[in-house]
Amino acid sequence: MVKRTHGYRYKSRKLLRKKPRERGMSGLSRLLYEYKPGDKVVIDIDPTYITTAPHRRYQGKVGVVVGTRGRAYVIETYLGDKKKIVITTADHLVPYQGGS
């Protein structure tokens, strides 16, 4: 028997896939949106940009922008009861529209 690999994108076949109508380049408004520290964002991984994508466990998580590092944003989010820091670009962020 051969041991199966458990790579960085393991078990993400459906999660990191675009629907046929979403294929192609993302809209410019998503990329040009400026986030300020304190803004709430949703981590929505865009599978087109692999190098700056956060781990799949953060897909759909709501976080708060803490600051920037170059072109990337530093996001503070919770994973269970632990506070985590995610560093990613605006390609994988969407402004939070929900309640509190």
UniProtKB/Swiss-Prot annotation:
Q: Which Gene3D superfamilies match?
A: Ribosomal protein L21 (2.30.30.70)
Q: Where is this region: Disordered?
A: 1-22
| InterPro entries linked to this entry | Ribosomal_eL21, Ribosomal_eL21_arc, Ribosomal_eL21_CS, Ribosomal_eL21_sf, Translation_prot_SH3-like_sf
Q: Which domain of life is it from?
A: Archaea
SUPFAM superfamilies reported in the protein's UniProt record: Translation proteins SH3-like domain
Q: Which GO biological process entries does UniProt record here?
A: translation
One molecular function GO term is: structural constituent of ribosome
Could you state one GO cellular component term attached to this entry? Answer: ribosome
Q: Which residue windows does the record flag with biased composition (Basic residues)?
A: 1-21
Q: Which UniProt keywords apply?
A: Ribonucleoprotein, Ribosomal protein
One family from Pfam that matches here is Ribosomal_L21e
User: Which family does this protein fall into?
Assistant: Belongs to the eukaryotic ribosomal protein eL21 family.
Enumerate the PANTHER family for this protein. Answer: 60S RIBOSOMAL PROTEIN L21
> Which named protein is this?
Large ribosomal subunit protein eL21
**Native source organism of the sequence:** Pyrobaculum neutrophilum (strain DSM 2338 / JCM 9278 / NBRC 100436 / V24Sta)
